[in-house]
């Protein structure tokens, strides 16, 4: 290839470009797409940097005011707000950049950020192959396309726009989006054998009449093109396509025989699946969906297609192929996740999918039930995605239809194995230290980015299983989301009976999400879709509860209960992660006060967590109660810093301003934030100072104080151990309301079964059965296990074999 040759070709007009980003920007102009919108004036832009400059100049006054409100100090406002002056290493500019990004609305989903680039690279490689052809062939192909386009555009202008009253789109744009939809189907190999056969069987007149007029097949593909281009009008076209598709589905010509009717039925099903797929793309990319679309029971419509297909799949020519079956499976699982309506039909449909060929002519069911026969490094990402989708369904079945699964089948083991598979897809990061600690190695290897939608679904499933296993005080009914349980657990110990469920898989997946949120280059507030926000909200609420209450002895948490958590190496990993994030990674930018904090916390972490020169359990009384000891001060400084970081870097930037949470949930998050800060400082009215033995719950009550409550409390002089964190001026708040705060999209619910009836059911979708209290954590040792105990072929990593 000659130097300087333009190797990136526009998929619309075949114009060549020398750089991929120039081609992508040019293609947006074809579709009229401006994905970046200013939250202040609602003006849209093609490029993010243009919008950032717009906010820093046009909305400068508003930006300065917002910055002053956020920092509480006008003197800290940067003098220059120009784009070229931003110093990414400055803490002030990082805050300003976060504020600017919070004013940007991006019509793209979290998962797309991580896997869209691979699709672009794949398309560019295909285009580079096309460049190798002679220019004469390119000109001939372009000429033929112009002739077909002109003929179709003329026919569409006369017939289609009149038939469907598409007043929001032109005939030219319809063809543009149609081509984008076709390209997407071809590149992703969706029903790849169906469309060549369909188009070859139609003449030009028939193509217009049958494909565009009598049935909205052409419009459905155009709707897919609009969805992937993030066009806001795609929801309007989707509603028109859906109503007309189902209106035409009952119109079979009586002259056709049974075989022709089956062919028409399969044709209808293919385009219905494409239509549902385009809706899923809209939901994942935060494209607003109208109330008229929300009224459709899409999951039931999808199952109405799949149920006869699974019963007589041999009669279907295209849908029965292996590749198409797994595409349909992924579509079905994702719509199930959004609808939460698993029923007997769902069980039947899933039974068909797990009997399909998965690897080496073996069905998926055999691969799962007989134990994975392949190591975690041998599976492709496509295979892992299928397994992750199936694990989510198995989790629902285990709760609702347990008799349908083998008695020895453990969903948790499958989740651990699949998480290990995704971890192995992560490139090995270079070591940043000559002598890294064991915790640093674990974080480097196991805290990963999200690889796909199915990877995020696996993280959700791991979290759902953990919440499902939590035991609340007095057997209180448990909701599936942690934040919905918060009014019940805010004043009680939550984890001391369930600390064994705080395992490495749970913690590393949680910290992976936290790590992505703390990385400003990963995504912004507007890039998070509702499902992302749901899980993030729950994880943040859980960690606020853990670090502000569960790890501090009080009237509700005894020292023995704290010790059960502190002997868990996974809790050590969390403490080390936050120590590394708050202090080590920012070591060059710490203020003088923060450096003093760092020195004390570093000694504590080295002595008790990294080297184990000192024992957390034997020194627990000093850590929890000795107000003047270095260990007490360092421990509480670390907990306070973690809570502050969760609040300032995640809760407020990402959750309080999220459009996907209702006002009640935001109010509860604010209460949780205030409660967490207050809980770290309030005096112990009834503090247990007795035995650390877990066998005794007898408490001798006395009055003590964790940190001074008064905002005017003077720090100790330099000759004594300082209280390095100034006490907060937070008013005591009333107990949090017991109202139930839920999301727009809930977690998996327990479906009322037709028969046999397993338990009493009601209207509350969050009601679940009480779980038997598991055995306590082994106080002597604990392992980071990366595999199930029953699977000898799985990779088993013992991270803390020497912790005693």
From Swiss-Prot:
Keywords on record: DNA-binding, Metal-binding, Nucleus, Repeat, Zinc, Zinc-finger
InterPro entries hit by this protein: VerF-like (IPR051059), Znf_C2H2_sf (IPR036236), Znf_C2H2_type (IPR013087)
Q: Which domain of life is it from?
A: Eukaryota
What main location does UniProt list? nucleus
Biased composition of type Polar residues is found at 782-796
Localization recorded for this chain is:
Nucleus
Under Gene3D superfamilies, the record lists: Classic Zinc Finger
Q: Name one GO biological process term.
A: regulation of transcription by RNA polymerase II
Q: Where are the zinc fingers (C2H2-type)?
A: 8-30, 36-59
Q: Which GO terms describe its molecular function?
A: DNA-binding transcription factor activity, RNA polymerase II-specific; RNA polymerase II cis-regulatory region sequence-specific DNA binding; sequence-specific DNA binding; zinc ion binding
- Stretches the record annotates as Disordered: 782-804
Task: Give GO cellular component annotations, separated by semicolons.
Answer: chromatin; nucleus
What PANTHER family does the record point to?
MIP31509P, ZINC FINGER PROTEIN YGR067C
**In its UniProt entry, what is this protein called?**
Zinc finger protein YGR067C
Tell me the organism. Answer: Saccharomyces cerevisiae (strain ATCC 204508 / S288c)
